[in-house]
Amino acid sequence: MFKITGVVSFIDDDPNAKVKLNSEGRFMEIPLKMAQRFLNNNNDRIKGKKKKIPILFNHFNNLPQLGTVDNLEIIERGVNDNDGLGNKKRKVLQMTATLSNRSFIKALQESSHFYNTTDKHMEYYSPDGFLSGGNSNPSGEMVTGRSAIMKRFPGLSIGHLDNDGYDIEEISLCYAGARPGTILTDASYSDHCGLAEDDTGSNSTAFLKAWAAKPFAMMTSRAGKIAEDINMLGVKNESLVYGLENKEDDVNDKPLPPQQPIDQPIDVEVMKSSLPENNKEDISTTKDTTPNEVEEHNINTIENEISSPFTQKSPDELDTETMSRIQDEVKALAAESASLRDDIKKYIAEALVQKDSGSSSVRRDRSPVDRRDRDRTPPRRERRRRDYDDYDSEDDYEDRRPTKKLFRRSRDEGEFLHSRKNKREHSRNRFDEFEDSRFDEEDRDMYRRRPTPQQSFYEAQSLPRRLLKRQVIQDDFDEEDYYQVRKPAKRQRVIFEDDLDEFYQPPVQQRRLAPRAPVYQEPQYDDYVVVPRQKQQQHVLPAASQRRVVRPQQLRPQFHDQDVEYVTIDPQTGMEVEYEPVAPAPKKRVVKVAQPVQRQVVKQTQPRAPEPVEMEEGEIEEEEEVVEEQLAPVKKMPVPKAVPVKRAEAVDAQPTPPQAAAPTQEYSFKKPTGKTTEAHFDELMDQMF
């Protein structure tokens, strides 16, 4: 995968300029308004409203696209004008794109691999993994994905629509673009796949054919355009392609002799082969020459060159001015050659002195390989053995590292650890000395589980017994110590503090084989708010600081567990019912006659005082539950006084339901001390609320 950056087009300096087209109908520079419209369209493409701008190869629609445009932006860049005006800032439209076509990358890898292995016959190395193989160390020529793509396809070209807006349809990667300054400025290869591992490019042959179909003359004709763009934007030299030649080539430039490092001795034979044949004798012999002899020798050499058949004029035909100029040049060359000869003799003398003195050891120390052998770190085993030497003995070493001694098993313990029992006892004895001193009793309580509001009643059963025995209504109960603080629930039931004792019920005895009794279905409240009773305003809840929230599982935990077998208790005898569950007794009502009931009778009698109603022992007069019988009004008779009717006669005249004749049951507001049932609990709830 390639990440490329390049200039797509220059922006006109005039902000109000219009689109300027050339003779072929192409715009060389775009106005600022058009660039802004290109940016807005590209933002819509990035957001997914439109398709992204594709990247093609040389405007070939029959080949698959190379990638898509990631971003378009307007920046200011320094531009070197080719007309000699110098460097100045200009606005350009810059593109950032991603090339993800595996076929194109594979074709680029194959062509680079063929060029570096077959054509150049040189060693190479690829630090970014663009080419597989090569040298592992940085030796030879460096071949990267950046150099491969910028040496072959450094140009960019816009493919626009022929409409009024000239909207961008695609951007192509090509040999050279037609607009000025449209080249790649940067490229990076980030996929370390290599040539051998890249097997996904099935259309790489099509790209290779497209590259081979281009005539050489067409590619070389674009060389001048690429050179101008490179000089204009100041791109690195690795973008120079197609064998660009130096225009200011000097004919007198000759290759210099190969330079050798100072540390190594100079080979005299190599130096002789690099110098002219006439100067070989001067180096081999130690005879000193005077400047006059050198000047005469150079003059003779130049005369021989002038008299060669390649010259158009003979020495006699040369004028005086030309001869004087040649003599000046010869003198300058003679001075340079004399200084060069002195330097060569100096280097040879130093090399001979170093060879005689035997200073090769110094050069060996300068070698990085020998320095690595001298300062190499000891192996792993040597480092471990060196740690043992720091202590007095091996036992002292083990005492300072008790963790290694715990889990180390010696050969003598093999027979002892053979049986499972001995192995278990041995492992337990190994940690006895650390178990007692690791935690105190108070520290161990910190690691016990704490109940949370999210835990059900089942999970609370697995907690330590001392937490279950803790009373909920104690004054020193710290809620934050055992429960998480949360916001008040939506559904709350208000319970007064003086009624909390009656509301709390002890858990029912559990028996495994007892029949299931009907379970009281309590309304689903999130929690209960316990508030102090106020005499004047009972309907107003106190402040939040005076409230005390009690969870449902604290008040009645037995009714939140639907899988517990309950035992039915007879409330009168207090004995356990073995097999038949006792149904809840019907509610009883006590009827109290406040005034004697008068009825119309045929027989006229004298009125009598009403007989008092005899209350059975244990009955309670409840004024709230008085039943007043609605009877017809009594008609006045000519008899002066009416005859009262007894309660028995009234009952005979209008019988009551059989529930009224059933025996009543005594109710008490005291906290029950014995076993109760769900029916008894319902009765207590009716009395309280």
UniProtKB/Swiss-Prot annotation:
Domain of life: Viruses
Protein name, entry field: Uncharacterized protein ORF107
Coiled-coil blocks: 320-351
Signal sequence, start to end: none
Keyword Coiled coil belongs to the record: yes
Region of interest called Disordered, as start-end residue ranges on this chain: 274-322, 354-436, 602-624, 649-689
Function as written in the Swiss-Prot or TrEMBL entry: May act as an apoptosis inhibitor.
Residue spans of biased composition, Acidic residues class: 613-624
Originating organism: Ostreid herpesvirus 1 (isolate France)
Stretches with biased composition (Basic and acidic residues): 362-388, 409-418
Record keywords: Coiled coil
